[in-house]
From Swiss-Prot:
PANTHER family: TRYPSIN, TRYPSIN-RELATED. The lineage of its organism: Eukaryota, Metazoa, Chordata, Craniata, Vertebrata. One of its GO terms (biological process) is proteolysis. This is Trypsin. Disulfide bonds join 27-157, 45-61, 129-230, 136-203, 168-182, 193-217.
Amino acid sequence: MKFLLLCVLLGAAAAFDDDKIIGGATCAKSSVPYIVSLNSGYHFCGGSLITNQWVVSAAHCYKASIQVRLGEHNIALSEGTEQFISSSKVIRHSGYNSYTLDNDIMLIKLSSPASLNAAVNTVPLPSGCSAAGTSCLISGWGNTLSNGSNYPDLLQCLNAPILTNAQCNSAYPGEITANMICVGYMEGGKDSCQGDSGGPVVCNGQLQGVVSWGYGCAMRNYPGVYTKVCNYNAWIQNTIAAN
């Protein structure tokens, strides 16, 4: 059965096996200025700021109304760098399939533009698709344990490589579409997890992945699966232009 990396925390219970960072370390403050926390009274997913008014996240993180929290590091404290902006539009890809998680991508329009500064900034969309072996930065406030739960207040970072299509398909036979990539370690121990869903995978300074799904978290032979953002440049640009 497919366990989604959905950071849906209802009290102490996660509704799905969501992706959170396991095996990483606390990020340096403001070192990931493009990451946002999606909030509906609690942090439930991540996202990436791509313009001063648009955020990319995962379609499985959809809610009709979202508060986007920018400039966050410690999500339990007010640190003076935060901007909280409500969504004015939340647009899932029309081809999103909630069973296969194909086209697991969505755009959020902010009700007002963010103020860009050292703590809040955009990440470029990909100029092309990154090759297997490329090292990428994954970040989020998701679960840090593969067994049990520990949701950190401080943003976590993990460097991990893009895996080959062969490795990805061998881990998940028949489940990987052309719109997915695997990132991580076949030996396990380092991965995204519940609560990281929708968050960024940035390779060579460009947004190449969105945290999507996986079997458990950080399990041997089951790397994390991510939406392949380089396939969606036209959809992103056209959607922004039309809205």
